[in-house]
From Swiss-Prot:
Species per Swiss-Prot/TrEMBL record: Shigella sonnei (strain Ss046)
Protein name per Swiss-Prot or TrEMBL: UPF0102 protein YraN
Annotated segments matching region Disordered: 1-21
SUPFAM superfamilies xrefs: Restriction endonuclease-like
Listed Polar residues bias regions: 1-19
Gene3D superfamilies, per the entry: 3.40.1350.10
Sequence similarity: Belongs to the UPF0102 family.
InterPro entries attached to this UniProt entry: Restrct_endonuc-II-like, tRNA_endonuc-like_dom_sf, UPF0102_YraN-like
Xref: HAMAP family: UPF0102 (MF_00048)
A Pfam short name: UPF0102
Domain of life: Bacteria
Listed GO MF terms: nucleic acid binding
Length: 131
């Protein structure tokens, strides 16, 4: 778990949620620097969550953000399993429906922003509803 210095000078442990939020904020800034426009963060639908929803031109981009301290067990990108992909697809499907859209009517893709140590990897179109 990550630590952060407190005002008293002694470090305090960050919760998993706080650590995840920090990496998601970093991914958002990084993607905005690449020209994407922010739409939403931490979108919850039945049974799933999408870390970031961005826009690149006319494309809606659903982003999964992952962080791993090292690549010892395959790195951050390797942690996006088929099961996780299925949940993300279902969550995106529900979000699109709430916004009067579907995979058939909205140009969209699923990206992964993976932080492994100090390295960032942006995997565009990492998976889709036909995978």
């Amino acid at each position: 778990m990550a630590t952060v210095p407190t005002r008293s000078g002694s470090p305090r442990q960050l919760t998993t949620k706080q650590t995840g939020d920090a990496w998601e904020a970093q991914a958002r800034r990084w993607l905005e620097g690449k020209g994407l426009r922010f739409i939403a963060a931490n979108v919850n639908e039945r049974g799933g969550e999408i870390d970031l929803i961005m826009r690149e031109g006319r494309t809606t981009v659903f982003v999964e953000v992952r962080y791993r301290r090292s690549a010892l067990y395959g790195g951050a990108a390797a942690s996006v399993t088929r099961s996780k992909q299925h949940k993300l697809l279902q969550t995106a499907r529900l979000w699109l429906a709430r916004h009067n859209g579907s995979f058939d009517t909205v140009d969209c893709r699923f990206d992964v922003v993976a932080f492994t140590g100090n390295e960032v990897e942006w995997i565009k179109d990492a998976f889709n509803d036909h995978s």
